[in-house]
Amino acid sequence: MLRVAVPNKGSLSESAAEILSEAGYRRRTDSRDLTVLDPANQVEFFFLRPKDIAIYVGSGELDLGITGRDLAGDSGAPVSERLSLGFGRSSFRYAAPAGKDWAVEDLSGLRIATSYPNLVRKDLTDRGLDATVIRLDGAVEISIQLGVADAIADVVGSGRTLRQHNLVAFGESLCDSEGVLIERTGAPQDDPARNQLIERVRGIVFAQQNLMIDYDCPRTILDDAIKMTPGMESPTLSPLADPDWVAVRAMVPIKGHNQVMDALAELGAKAILASNIRSVRAF
């Protein structure tokens, strides 16, 4: 039976549960449950702390896991990404007191507080910088005010928390993170339950990033319309009662789909409809 780790709480938890549910897997009914057995799909789910998931997967105790790219990278565990899941996006950056034009090189000789010490040490080593890394389990922003650190490295979303503590982010992102599906590096690839879960989740993620466009199109502009909506292999064409018109159906990326609809309307297409897709296979 396939053994899969899922975040038990935090920003990744609900999105991970939603994707697995959409993919046809059982959800836990009580937030206190640590395991859920899904015999129909030959899977057992284990609900763990997000930062521990890569350790369990890397050790081979669990087959797959959903966690953050930043957490997996900081763990140092021998895991590989199978899928990017498109949720929980954030950047991991250095920050220091506002009022100075900071550069990463300014960190040399300073104390840096972070909850991701391995990511920070690797980045400093790659840059040839010598700084003291102080590991904290949370609320690293307050460490400068308390005199524990001179700068921090932390996950940055809107930047509101940094501004509240009069801090400013600087330098490039150390890690652009999001939810990812991981497995142990070098793990066997021939488990049917494993492959089924990966393909189901891949189909859900793809569906969340695309939608279906339907429209009626005069044959005189069909070639130009198809260039705007080429679909995956090619668009579906269906004859209408009027022989001079056809119905067109094609999948397009959600990003920019309104511009595509505008362009089709300007070209002369009619009854242009966009609809969501729940899941996809064989793409």
From Swiss-Prot:
Task: Describe which pathway this protein belongs to, using the record's wording.
Answer: Amino-acid biosynthesis; L-histidine biosynthesis; L-histidine from 5-phospho-alpha-D-ribose 1-diphosphate: step 1/9
A GO molecular function assigned to this protein is: ATP phosphoribosyltransferase activity
UniProt keywords (A-Z) are: Amino-acid biosynthesis, ATP-binding, Cytoplasm, Glycosyltransferase, Histidine biosynthesis, Magnesium, Metal-binding, Nucleotide-binding, Transferase
| Swiss-Prot/TrEMBL GO biological process terms | L-histidine biosynthetic process
Instruction: Please list which residues make up the signal peptide.
Output: none
Disulfide connectivity?
Answer: none
Tell where it localizes: Cytoplasm
Record has Nucleotide-binding as a keyword: yes
* Coiled-coil annotated residue ranges, if any: none
Task: Identify the GO cellular component terms for this protein.
Answer: cytoplasm
Q: What is its EC number?
A: 2.4.2.17
Q: Which HAMAP family match?
A: HisG_Long
Function comment:
Catalyzes the condensation of ATP and 5-phosphoribose 1-diphosphate to form N'-(5'-phosphoribosyl)-ATP (PR-ATP). Has a crucial role in the pathway because the rate of histidine biosynthesis seems to be controlled primarily by regulation of HisG enzymatic activity.
Extract the InterPro entries matched here: ATP-PRT_HisG_long, ATP_PRibTrfase_cat, ATP_PRibTrfase_CS, ATP_PRibTrfase_HisG, HisG_C, N-reg_PII-like_a/b, N-reg_PII/ATP_PRibTrfase_C
Q: Which cofactor does it need?
A: Mg(2+)
Its gene is: hisG
Q: Identify the NCBIfam families for this entry.
A: hisG (TIGR00070), HisG_C-term (TIGR03455)
Notes on activation and inhibition: Feedback inhibited by histidine.
According to its UniProt record, which protein family does this protein belong to?
Belongs to the ATP phosphoribosyltransferase family. Long subfamily.
Reactions mediated catalytically: 1-(5-phospho-beta-D-ribosyl)-ATP + diphosphate = 5-phospho-alpha-D-ribose 1-diphosphate + ATP
Q: What is this protein called?
A: ATP phosphoribosyltransferase
Primary location class: cytoplasm
